[in-house]
Amino acid sequence: MKLTHKILLIIGLTSIMSSCRQDIVPNELLPKFDRILQDPTALTQYDFSESTPFHHIALPFDFGSNQFHDSLIIDKLENTHIKYITYIYSDYKKVDEFKQEELNRERLYGLYQYMPNLFDDDEVEWSTIVQTGGQTEKQATNLFHGFVVHYRPSPTMESMKAEIDYLKSMIDTALTFVAPTTEGTSLIITLGTDIAISDSAGFYYERELDFSTVTAHTSALGTYDFGNYFNDTSVSAVRNRNKHWERMLIHCDLTGSMSPYSAQLFVWHRLNIDKNKVQHFVFFNDGDMTTDDQKKAGKTGGIYYSKADNFDDLQKIAYKCMSNGSGGDAPENDIEAMLEGFKKCKDCKDIILIADNWANLRDYEFINKIDRPVRIILCGTQFGINKQYLDLARATKGSIHTIEEDIENLMDLKEGQEITINGHAFVIENGRFTEVKKI
């Protein structure tokens, strides 16, 4: 009888121990977490060196643990715009009975307890990577396990001043090394290295962009090439491929972190100003210093206009736009800026929007007011394409342009049809683009 009780006790304890992991995560959160975890990308080993030069912070776990290695790191993400989060784990099991999916959920729940809003934010994009390179416990322990969070700091007056100083330095250096009248000359610029902080295991905690210019020189390649430091040289790449654009009206987002792209635009324009390719510029910063709760879609403000024929005046207006624009959240007033631009140039031929792929359209609801084709140069597309800009291009019979390709046929897509852009598949559902998850 006593033996029977012992057996029952052992069975009971085993049952409790096997179920305690899943009890950590509330049932109502399981659908959110499972959507993030579905269809992971398999890699032998996650390599931080392949990350982009955007700000990012790593939040590591020890192998097999659901406790953050150092939860204080999460404080660095306060007052930031988080756009992309990657969860990384390995598939090695010390015992066959181990349930990896439960540990994955627990780790997500650990992040949820600190930042629950991330899991309900439609602007945050998630991905999951499973590492297959750990064939032993020692090998698996040496792999990174945790989250990599890509973010941008919220703009401040100080950060915008730093971006203006960088932009001035970039333009001045470029124009010193490349004569405006030189035909078939390219500008190659190497920028300062990034800042990395690592823990004792060698994992990056943080990586930031340094705006200083290190070297600049010319070559005879016939294009404007901004070097290999930036993974995204969208503006120069698109302009080099589309030399037929003319009588342009260019709308350029000058909110925080857009200076690497606006630098390419300004240098290109200065080197081509005598060709009269561009007639007008419109810069926008999403409402100047207006606080987020006071911004109204369609009437946000922070829009600045300049003719294209005087480069000095153009720079002054651009810097004024940047100086006045440090009070914002992520969405931008692209539609409002374009409607203002149309008033200035009714006979412009090619309408260009240089847009921040990280930011949604604050005034998306007014897309139907744009009655001219818009050529959208998307900046920051390393992690995917913002669907709202696809909708804008299709609705206006315009086009999307990334560092890799030009997509001109969006207006021809019918309901239910699919298209692949930069390796991401999209389908038209209810008149809008929806990303297709590949299984």
What function would you assign to each model-found segment?
Residues I400-I439:
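C-terminal "exit" segments of structured domains
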Residues D23-E28, K94-E101, M258-A263, M289-Q294, ...:
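Extracytoplasmic/secreted cell-surface and envelope-processing proteins
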Residues K76-E78, I189-L249, S259-A263, L271-V278:
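Acidic, polar low-complexity linker/tail segments
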Residues N66, K99-S127, N357-T396, H401-E404, ...:
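VWA/integrin I-like adhesion module and closely mimicked acidic/polar interface patches used
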Residues M1-N27:
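Bacterial Sec-dependent N-terminal signal peptides
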Residues Y89-S90, D253-T255, M338, K346-L361, ...:
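DG-centered beta-turn motif at the end of beta-strands
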Residues E50-D70, I85-Q100, D122-T136, H244-K349, A359-L361, ...:
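Von Willebrand factor
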